C-alpha cells in the first residue's frame, strides 16, 4: 500500500511515510509547529503540480479551512502562472491564505528574508523543493526543511504541525 512520504531534515535520505512523521518528529525533538510551507520554484511547480494542490485547497475552502501557517506558492514560469490564474487555481490557493510569489528561484535558493524567525532559532518548514540542506532556504542553519509533494505541503499547511497526519486526522 502506498502512502505519501516526507523527507528530511537536511537530507533526502531521511524518508518516512506521513503516518510515521509524528513519532519521528517527537523522537528527534524537531520543532513540531511548522513555521512556513512552500510550493514551487522549478520543482513541483508545473500546471499539473499546482493544479493538484489547488484542488485540495478548493476542497478545504468549501469547509472554511485556512492554512495555519504562511503558505507561499512559486509558479514554475510566467506561462504556468497565467494558466493557473486563468483556470482559477490561484484563486483556490489564495482562498486558504496562500501568497503567490514571483516566478523565480526565491526561497529555494535562499532569497528569502524572514522576519518571523531569528537567526539561529530552530524551526521547521515544509516544501516541495528538491533541496533541503542546512541554510538552503532562509540562510538559517537551524531551519529544519522537510520535503513533500505539493499535495502533502498543502495538507501539512492546513494542519500546521508535523504531527498532523492528513490521511487520518481531521480539521475543524
Regions found by a protein language model. Give the residues of each.
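Fe-S-dependent hydro-lyases/dehydratases of central metabolism
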Residues: 1-172
Amino acid at each position: 500500500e502506498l502512502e505519501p512520504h516526507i523527507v528530511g531534515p537536511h537530507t533526502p535520505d531521511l524518508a518516512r511515510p506521513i503516518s510515521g512523521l509524528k513519532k519521528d518528529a517527537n523522537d528527534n525533538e524537531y520543532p513540531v509547529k511548522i513555521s512556513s510551507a512552500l510550493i514551487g520554484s522549478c520543482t513541483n511547480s508545473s500546471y499539473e503540480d499546482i493544479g493538484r494542490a489547488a484542488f485540495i485547497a478548493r476542497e478545504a475552502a468549501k469547509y472554511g479551512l485556512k492554512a495555519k501557517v504562511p503558505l507561499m506558492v512559486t509558479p514554475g514560469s510566467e506561462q504556468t502562472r497565467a494558466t493557473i490564474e486563468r483556470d482559477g487555481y490561484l484563486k483556490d490557493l489564495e482562498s486558504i491564505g496562500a501568497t503567490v510569489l514571483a516566478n523565480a528561484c526565491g526561497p529555494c535558493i535562499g532569497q528569502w528574508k524572514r522576519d518571523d524567525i531569528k537567526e539561529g532559532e530552530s524551526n521547521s518548514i515544509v516544501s516541495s523543493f528538491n533541496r533541503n540542506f542546512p541554510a538552503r532556504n532562509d540562510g538559517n542553519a537551524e531551519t529544519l526543511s522537510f520535503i513533500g509533494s505539493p499535495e502533502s505541503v498543502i495538507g501539512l499547511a492546513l494542519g500546521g504541525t508535523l504531527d498532523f497526519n492528513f490521511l487520518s486526522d481531521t480539521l475543524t
